[in-house]
A protein has these predicted regions:
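Conserved S-adenosyl-L-methionine
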Residues: 1-78, 83-85, 94, 102, ...
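A conserved structural/catalytic subdomain of Rossmann-like adenosyl-cofactor enzymes
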Residues: 64-217
Length: 217
């Protein structure tokens, strides 16, 4: 939704006064997948309430062979489920080749690499364990992103940003799919505040690093 709102605010004349580009925005640009049918309905309704006439919102187990998408997307924005595990038998074999694991947070990163076009970018929220985990699977997915793709930024977020639902520490990874590496200088930012209190109430507060992150990146 925010990506669509950004395009409306900043690219309105370029997109919405061109028939072909407008059709792409309305009918082909935005894709979403979930295994919760209620969330699918909410997601589709939310997109339509924000000018997208026909969002492609589909029931799909993204980590299984049900998902054939490869080299398809130019941008992936994701907050995938983590702190969970799956039966390896239902996970797509090509993802397990990247990192053999049951941990969803690692498998989704492998999936995003596969789904991106070369030159496509991903901004993904991950638990801190992805950055510091010592298992072979953790090391394998970090190697994939750092050595085979181009890692551009790591934005560390305080542990309260997802309260009251979760208190885990998280970070945003931003990377570009290259297929041949290219990681050089990685931009790090330690976010201290996001404009809301870091307790269960999540009340508005003055401190907010988000605009500084946008301006500095």
């Amino acid at each position: 939704v925010e990506a669509g709102e950004y395009l409306w605010a900043n690219k309105k004349d370029e997109i919405f006064y061109d028939k072909q580009k407008k059709d792409h925005f309305m009918n082909h640009m935005f894709h979403g997948y979930d295994m919760d049918r209620t969330m699918l309905r909410i997601g589709a309704m939310n997109m339509m309430n924000h000018r997208v006439e026909s969002p492609f919102i589909e029931y799909r187990d993204s980590l299984s062979d049900q998902n054939p998408d490869k080299d398809k997307y130019s941008l992936i924005l994701a907050n995938p489920p983590f702190k969970g595990s799956l039966d390896a038998d239902i996970v797509s074999a090509d993802l397990l080749k990247v990192c053999k694991t049951k941990k969803t947070e690692l498998l989704f990163l492998a999936l995003f690499v596969r789904m991106l076009k070369v030159g496509g970018r991903c901004a993904c929220i991950v638990p801190d364990g992805v950055l510091f985990g010592s298992s072979k699977a953790h090391k394998d997915i970090r190697k994939e992103i750092v050595e085979n793709q181009r890692l551009e930024a790591v934005i560390s977020m305080p542990s309260g940003v997802f309260k009251p639902y979760a208190g885990v520490s998280t970070a945003i990874l931003i990377f570009t799919k290259t297929g041949h590496g290219g990681t050089d200088k990685v931009w790090f930012y330690d976010m201290k505040a996001d404009g809301r209190s870091l307790d269960d109430k999540r009340s508005e507060v003055k401190e907010n690093d988000i605009q500084d992150i946008i301006a500095s990146f």
